[in-house]
């Protein structure tokens, strides 16, 4: 048997090697930029989505079911009336918002019979401080009492509306071709479902195999739709969406189970499944995403901004061609959990802090 001091030394060496592994293979560059951080308006508990109305006026959702109009120049904040009822349980509630002209799109967890909920898309006209003529454009056909994995990020691109649905914590539904669960949905601007992009998929399904989409954006040059989603323990990923593609969850994943075991057979690639263009290990719990194409921060121009819930930080991903090549943390633990990211017309960066005492923040050149 080995002497006790040798056992201790072996254990110490293993610990040192483990630390060195994480330093060299999981390092993130921290390069915070000099910014002026301003809190805009009164606190909003757990804000989730932001979209510009016009000028300095923006809409901000709160997960509890409230919608606010906020003037980022004055901080004035006004509630919007006639918001649809929501299933405000755990991750559910009033989630993303996108506005174009006077038309407002809301993605939310819609209350259904027997205590269940479904991810849904709602459309209305904003007139003054109220929504008018509201209608539900889409309701998922997968109902659950679960308060997890609603997805719900929206982007408008060309003639279509795209939005991502999570699998509600029931992973196998992401591969069920009869369900909208774990899918990106595509609707025409009139609210009609676009043709299915894959064989035997329901109308409107553009892609499948998603776990929990939390960020979506249109690339300003290529027009491609980029989407990021949460993995389990590790394996958060960015995908460039292709019509008819299956992104693999839960058959393929770069993450592991929360208890440490393999997800399924532990596959990170398999025939018939699309690969991500970026993977985070360990997870950062990404949320919100925006391409930066303004001049206020020239060092960020042409890159991608991603918020992190887990590390309460803002990430900047530099692109090589049209794919991510490297990342750096440019704002670290200043405002809490970053839920959404948007770039204002003047180049300032708008962030939502998902905290009980959260709200809207503006980052500008110091």
Protein language model regions, located:
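Acidic, Gly/Ser/Thr-rich repeat motifs that build Ca2+-stabilized beta-propeller blades
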Residues: 30-170, 218, 223-231, 282-320, ...
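Short, glycine/acidic-rich beta->alpha junctions
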Residues: 42, 146, 205-209, 333
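Short, Lys/Arg-enriched N-terminal segments with co-localized hydrophobic residues
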Residues: 1-8
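Beta-propeller domain segments
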Residues: 92-94, 167-328, 336, 346-347, ...
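Repeated scaffold domains used in trafficking and secretory/extracellular systems
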Residues: 338-340
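Bacterial N-terminal signal peptides
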Residues: 17-26
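Short, solvent-exposed aromatic-acidic interface loops
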Residues: 110, 138-142, 200, 255-257, ...
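Bacterial N-terminal signal peptides that target proteins for export
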Residues: 8-17
């Amino acid at each position: 048997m080995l002497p006790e001091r040798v056992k201790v030394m072996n254990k110490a060496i293993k610990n040192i090697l483990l630390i060195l592994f994480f330093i060299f293979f999981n390092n993130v560059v921290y390069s915070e930029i000099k910014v002026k951080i301003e809190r805009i308006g009164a606190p909003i508990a757990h804000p989730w989505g932001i979209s510009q109305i016009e000028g300095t006026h923006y809409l901000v959702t709160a997960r509890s079911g409230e919608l606010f109009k906020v003037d980022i120049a004055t901080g004035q904040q006004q509630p919007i009336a006639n918001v649809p009822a929501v299933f405000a349980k755990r991750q559910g509630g009033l989630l993303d918002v996108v506005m174009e002209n006077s038309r407002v799109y809301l993605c939310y967890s819609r209350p259904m019979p027997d205590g269940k909920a479904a991810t849904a898309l709602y459309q209305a006209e904003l007139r003054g401080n109220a929504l008018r003529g509201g209608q539900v454009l889409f309701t998922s056909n997968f109902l659950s009492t679960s308060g997890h994995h609603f997805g719900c990020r929206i982007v408008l691109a060309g003639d279509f509306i795209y939005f991502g649905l999570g699998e509600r914590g029931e992973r196998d539904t992401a591969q069920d071709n009869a369900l909208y669960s774990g899918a990106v949905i595509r609707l025409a601007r009139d609210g009609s479902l676009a043709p299915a992009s894959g064989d035997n998929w329901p109308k409107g399904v553009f892609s499948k195999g998603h776990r929990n989409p939390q960020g979506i954006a249109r690339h300003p040059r290529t027009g491609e739709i980029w989407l990021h989603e949460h993995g389990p323990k590790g394996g958060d990923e960015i995908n460039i969406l292709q019509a008819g593609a299956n992104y693999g969850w839960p058959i393929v994943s770069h993450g592991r189970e929360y208890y440490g075991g393999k997800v399924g057979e532990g596959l990170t690639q398999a025939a018939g499944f699309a690969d991500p263009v970026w993977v985070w290990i360990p997870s950062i719990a990404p949320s919100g995403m925006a391409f930066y194409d303004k001049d206020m921060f020239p060092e960020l121009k042409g890159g991608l901004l991603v918020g992190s819930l887990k590390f309460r930080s803002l990430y900047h991903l530099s692109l090589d061609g049209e794919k991510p090549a490297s990342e750096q943390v440019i704002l670290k633990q200043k405002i809490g959990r970053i839920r959404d990211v948007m770039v204002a017309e003047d180049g300032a960066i708008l962030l939502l802090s998902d905290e009980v005492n959260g709200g809207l923040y503006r980052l500008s050149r110091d």
